[in-house]
Amino acid sequence: MIRVGIVDDHTMVRTGLKHFLSEHVDVRVTGEGCNGAEALELARKGDVDVLLMDISMPDQSGVDALKAIKARFPELAVLILSGFPEAHYAAALLRQGAAGYINKECDPEEIIQAIRTVSLGRKYISQAVATLLAEGVAGGLERPPHELLSVRELQVFLRLARGETVGHMAEAMFLSVKTVSTYRTRVLEKLKLASNSDLTYYAMTHGLIQ
């Protein structure tokens, strides 16, 4: 029996996932949470084999929770279920220790397949993520600069590229304005850009925003 914890800030999403997973005899939902702090608590209790977690949540985000969980419970399989396109976060989150990354728009059967795969200690690589990784290999060792950003830097980059202000981001991400400004400076330096408009142009030309 695979014990699964579900962490998502939307009650409807958690309810839908629980109903779907209850139809499979080899899976049992043993816990749920609505933010990163509760994800960490589920990991601490040790009642789950797989943590199915969103990355965009209030309080402590899934990004921060993943980092904390892998630091304290490296053997726990954390499967990211996100509404963001794979091109945005998949590679960075896999490097950070996620066992897999699947999009919320995927076929429901892919979720159960992913859970079974990561419960065996293996990585789950969806077809979309596999294509991204293959394109990276085909392109040689030189990766585009944005793929070298940390997950948090990538979050800040994409929000800036969409026109969000530092103040709004600080509030939405539960960070100080100074911290967000520091991330902005790092992103500009790593991408060798000078302004927010440069970030927007870069993101559009690389297909990261529309």
Cite the ranges covered by each PLM segment.
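The feature encodes the CheY-like receiver
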Residues: 13, 58
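Active-site residues of response regulator receiver
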Residues: 54, 82
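Acidic, metal-coordinating helix/loop segments flanking the phosphotransfer/catalytic sites
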Residues: 32-50
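Short amphipathic alpha-helix used as the core "switch/output" element in two-component signaling
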Residues: 41, 63-75
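Short, flexible helix-to-coil linker/hinge segments that flank and couple to helix-turn-helix
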Residues: 88-95, 100-155, 208-209
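Helix-turn-helix DNA-binding segment
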Residues: 142-178
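Recognition helix of helix-turn-helix DNA-binding domains
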Residues: 165-198
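Acidic catalytic/metal-coordinating carboxylates
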Residues: 35-38, 61-64, 85
